[in-house]
Regions:
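Single conserved hydrophobic/aromatic residue that forms the stacking wall/gate
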Residues: 1-11
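Short, low-complexity export/processing leader segments characterized by acidic and small residues
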Residues: 11-13, 81
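Acidic, turn-prone loop/beta-hairpin segments
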Residues: 21-112, 119-134, 157, 163-168, ...
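Short cysteine-rich clusters marking metal-coordination/redox-active sites
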Residues: 178-181, 189-192
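Short functional micro-motifs and their immediate structural scaffolds
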Residues: 183-186, 197
Length: 197
């Protein structure tokens, strides 16, 4: 029914193909002390706690077993806990609209990247370099994002458009592939070098 479709949309579309995908690099390659990585771990813990509680009535023993491994409270059973309290300030319609628009830009970029992959010009998206040519409203949406991480490419830049609402140019990234993070960079990968020291 509707509940099943909503769960699938949440887990498959929002988490698996979006959040988990763009955060893999941070989790695997950033320093264990990196603020970005620590914030990501906090979010993943909130997601895990919420999903465990959500599935507890259906997957009684499985959720109990997982809970016993990750339990940080004094409660012996997940079934004795309340649902995770989500702060009221997290319900933010402006932020929701912003991310909805960002998601649409990402979908457009994914289509452009997939065309290059289908034509065998690149293998994975990390072999790509993208340029986003956007009108002012969309251009400003990307201001505080690490574009290469968000689009899962080796290099990303944006340019203000005078005509097109959105235009995305994709080409093969130039440089050497970092053996650790797999990004193709013109210089030695500073992040990975620092982490390995």
């Amino acid at each position: 029914g509707i509940g099943r479709r909503q769960r699938q949309m949440c887990i498959r579309d929002s988490l698996s193909s979006f959040y988990f995908d763009i955060r893999k690099d941070v989790l695997y390659c950033d320093s264990i002390n990196s603020k970005k990585r620590k914030n990501c771990v906090i979010v993943l813990n909130i997601i895990l706690e919420s999903l465990l509680k959500w599935f507890a009535p259906i997957l009684v023993f499985t959720t109990e077993e997982i809970y016993s491994l990750v339990n940080k409270s004094n409660s012996e059973s997940i079934h004795e806990n309340n649902f995770v309290k989500i702060p009221a300030q997290w319900k933010n319609e402006k932020l929701n609209e912003k991310w909805s628009n960002l998601f649409k830009i990402k979908q457009e970029a994914n289509i452009a990247i997939e065309e290059k992959r289908a034509n065998k010009e690149i293998g994975s998206s990390l072999e790509a370099e993208i340029k986003l040519i956007l009108k002012k409203d969309k251009f400003e949406l990307l201001d505080k994002l690490d574009l290469a991480d968000y689009f899962i490419v080796s290099k990303a830049e944006k340019e203000l458009s005078k005509n097109d609402d959105i235009k995305i140019e994709v080409k093969k990234a130039q440089g050497q592939k970092c053996e650790r993070c797999w990004k193709i960079l013109e210089k030695k990968c500073e992040r990975c070098s620092k982490v390995l020291q």
